């Protein structure tokens, strides 16, 4: 076993304790350099450039069943942990693809933030029902606020003081963008902790570092992949060794057909868990996507949800299903749930709803300077 990472695939067992040395100055300052800001902007520009697809275009995607599987995983997480009237904070909310999932959970209030201006505008029009999205749904039942800014850099507790505390925070397929530096990782977790109520939950999905590193070490070169994805590491990782004392800023280039083509960063889960504990966020579970599917497909209600979403076909007319390459790509990801220490007093802050609106104009979007 090489230093810093386990060679075994992810499991639901708690990861080992972190062996990296924490920032001795704690989280008193989160300083960003220009290189980090440029990386964040590059990622934002990538997602802003992605246009909304029609239903026909979406169904023709070479990874349509992988997308549906990921939607199923997010839907299951939301159904497991969201309660009626919950206040939700959606970090890196993108184009609002999860709005309908939250609506079905009958939440009471929604705040979404994303760094990409184009994505936030698409989210606004989707929420308003102005765009002809494939959901064909015109009205959501909860008031909302939208913010445009880098949630891994700005202090959100000051900006959202009147909206907090939140019952649930979600960050789907984006947490790894905070792992460029320890400062950004700390800011991300500090924001989550500061805005969650005691007993509140943080749900998310992100790349599984154990799987990626295992595949890299099994490969002949510095690239892994198949017909739907590839991952390429730089020559600085030619020895395929990663120091446990330097778990931030481990960059690779990730390409996923019809979805992603930009730099990403390894998140060693043992470090993520240890850092989260510093911010009073305790691990409830972590599961690789394969394990997640096998476990929750044992429950009839989630089997029916899978059928409706069509990731494995609909069981009748649509006999298509995930390809072997899509299933392998799914193995690259994990789901996690953290809970903030403490017990909630059970009180609901109905006043926070006044900060949201049922229809959002462009002027209603709050732009946050980094």
From Swiss-Prot:
Enzyme class: transferase
Origin: domain of life: Eukaryota
EC number, as in UniProt: 2.1.1.56
Protein residues bound to mRNA: 70-71
Catalytic activity from the UniProt record: a 5'-end (5'-triphosphoguanosine)-ribonucleoside in mRNA + S-adenosyl-L-methionine = a 5'-end (N(7)-methyl 5'-triphosphoguanosine)-ribonucleoside in mRNA + S-adenosyl-L-homocysteine
Region (Disordered) residue spans: 1-34
Annotated site location: mRNA cap binding: 95, 101, 126, 176, 264, 333
Residue span(s) of domain mRNA cap 0 methyltransferase: 61-341
PROSITE patterns in the cross-refs: RNA_CAP0_MT
Bias-annotated ranges (Low complexity): 1-11
Parts forming coiled coils: none
UniProt KW keywords: Methyltransferase, mRNA capping, mRNA processing, Nucleus, RNA-binding, S-adenosyl-L-methionine, Transferase
Annotated residues for binding of S-adenosyl-L-methionine: 74, 92, 114, 150-151, 172-174
GO MF entry, a single one: RNA binding
Chain's role: mRNA-capping methyltransferase that methylates the N7 position of the added guanosine to the 5'-cap structure of mRNAs. Binds RNA containing 5'-terminal GpppC.
Family per similarity comment: Belongs to the class I-like SAM-binding methyltransferase superfamily. mRNA cap 0 methyltransferase family.
Protein name: mRNA cap guanine-N(7) methyltransferase 1
Phylogenetic lineage: Eukaryota, Viridiplantae, Streptophyta, Embryophyta, Tracheophyta
């Amino acid at each position: 076993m090489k230093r810093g990472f386990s060679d075994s695939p992810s499991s639901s067992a708690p990861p080992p304790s972190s062996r990296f040395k924490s920032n001795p100055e704690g989280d008193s300052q989160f300083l960003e350099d220009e290189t980090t800001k440029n990386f964040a902007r590059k990622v934002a520009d990538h997602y802003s450039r992605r246009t909304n697809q029609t239903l026909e275009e979406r169904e023709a995607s070479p990874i349509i069943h992988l997308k549906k599987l990921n939607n199923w995983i997010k839907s299951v997480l939301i159904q497991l942990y969201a309660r009626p009237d919950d206040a939700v904070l959606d970090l890196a909310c993108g184009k609002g693809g999860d709005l309908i999932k939250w609506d079905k959970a009958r939440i009471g209030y929604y705040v979404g933030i994303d760094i990409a201006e184009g994505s936030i505008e698409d989210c606004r029009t989707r929420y308003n029902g102005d765009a002809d999205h494939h959901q064909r749904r015109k009205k959501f039942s909860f008031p909302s606020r939208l913010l445009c800014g880098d949630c891994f850099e700005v202090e959100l507790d000051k900006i959202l003081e009147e909206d907090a505390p939140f019952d649930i925070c979600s960050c789907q397929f984006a947490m790894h963008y905070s792992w460029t530096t320890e400062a950004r990782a700390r800011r991300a977790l500090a924001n989550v902790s500061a805005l969650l109520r005691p007993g509140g939950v943080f749900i998310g999905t992100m790349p599984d570092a154990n799987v990626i590193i295992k595949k890299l070490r099994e490969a002949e070169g510095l690239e892994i992949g198949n017909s739907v994805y590839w991952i390429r590491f730089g020559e600085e990782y030619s020895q395929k060794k990663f120091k446990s004392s330097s778990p931030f800023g481990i960059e690779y280039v990730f390409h996923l057909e019809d979805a992603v083509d930009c730099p990403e960063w390894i998140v060693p889960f043992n470090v993520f868990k240890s850092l989260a504990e510093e911010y009073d966020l305790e691990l409830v579970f972590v599961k690789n996507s394969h394990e997640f599917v096998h476990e929750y497909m044992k429950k009839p209600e989630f089997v029916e949800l899978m059928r409706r979403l069509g990731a494995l076909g609909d069981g009748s007319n649509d006999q298509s299903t995930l390809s072997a390459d899509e299933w392998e790509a799914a193995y690259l990801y994990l789901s996690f749930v953290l809970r903030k220490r403490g017990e909630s007093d059970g009180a609901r802050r109905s006043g926070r709803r006044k900060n949201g609106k049922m229809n959002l104009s462009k002027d209603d979007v709050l732009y946050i300077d980094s």
